[in-house]
């Protein structure tokens, strides 16, 4: 079992943790999040970005992690970036808690997400269905109020 954790922080009030667990290289990864400080009753883009670099805030994280050269999509789409986690849904206080299993996200192997950055966006991810070029790259998810590097956990 490999475990990883990401502590989300940023210029905004958005903060939280994201944990990852994977039993073996062929197993799906369980991703669990507990995030506060978002707008209430909203959907916010939630992605793994390429670089574990936050020197210039969340912008330094680069584009979505996409080792297979696909277009942006929903987590359940065949054509998607590895880093496309879709949207988190917030409650009436702006908090989001949840968990999902993802067979594209790996902690083990050549396309591991360890050392990369999780970004919570300021807008809703259109899941690549926005009908424009930016939708196929970013899902038009908007600014990056919070992010954190994924690190190996005990």
From Swiss-Prot:
Cofactor binding note: Binds 1 copper ion per subunit. Binds 1 zinc ion per subunit.
Disulfide bonds listed in the record: 58-147
Needed co-factor(s): Cu cation; Zn(2+)
GO cellular component: cytoplasm
MF annotations from Gene Ontology: copper ion binding; superoxide dismutase activity
Residues noted as binding Zn(2+) in the record, renumbered to the chain: 64, 72, 81, 84
Binding residue positions for Cu cation: 47, 49, 64, 121
Location in or out of the cell: Cytoplasm
E.C. number(s) listed in UniProt: 1.15.1.1
Catalyzed chemical reaction(s): 2 superoxide + 2 H(+) = H2O2 + O2
InterPro entries reported in the protein's UniProt record: SOD-like_Cu/Zn_dom_sf (IPR036423), SOD_Cu/Zn_/chaperone (IPR024134), SOD_Cu/Zn_BS (IPR018152), SOD_Cu_Zn_dom (IPR001424)
Residues the record lists as binding substrate: 144
Function recorded in the entry: Destroys radicals which are normally produced within the cells and which are toxic to biological systems.
Designated name of the protein: Superoxide dismutase [Cu-Zn]
Protein's gene: SOD1
């Amino acid at each position: 079992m490999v475990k990883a954790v990401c502590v989300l922080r940023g210029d905004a009030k958005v903060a939280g943790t994201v944990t990852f667990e994977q039993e073996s290289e062929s197993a799906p990864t369980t991703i669990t999040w507990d995030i506060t400080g978002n707008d209430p009753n909203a959907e916010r883009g939630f992605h793994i970005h390429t670089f574990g670099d936050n020197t210039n805030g969340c912008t330094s994280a680069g584009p979505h992690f996409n080792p297979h050269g696909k277009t942006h999509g929903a987590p359940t789409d065949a054509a998607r970036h590895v880093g496309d986690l879709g949207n988190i849904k917030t409650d009436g206080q702006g908090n989001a808690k949840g968990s999902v299993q993802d067979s594209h996200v790996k902690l083990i192997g050549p396309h591991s997400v360890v050392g990369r950055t999780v970004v919570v966006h300021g807008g809703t991810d259109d899941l690549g269905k926005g009908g424009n070029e930016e939708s196929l790259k970013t899902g038009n998810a908007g600014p990056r109020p919070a992010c954190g590097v994924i690190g190996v956990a005990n």
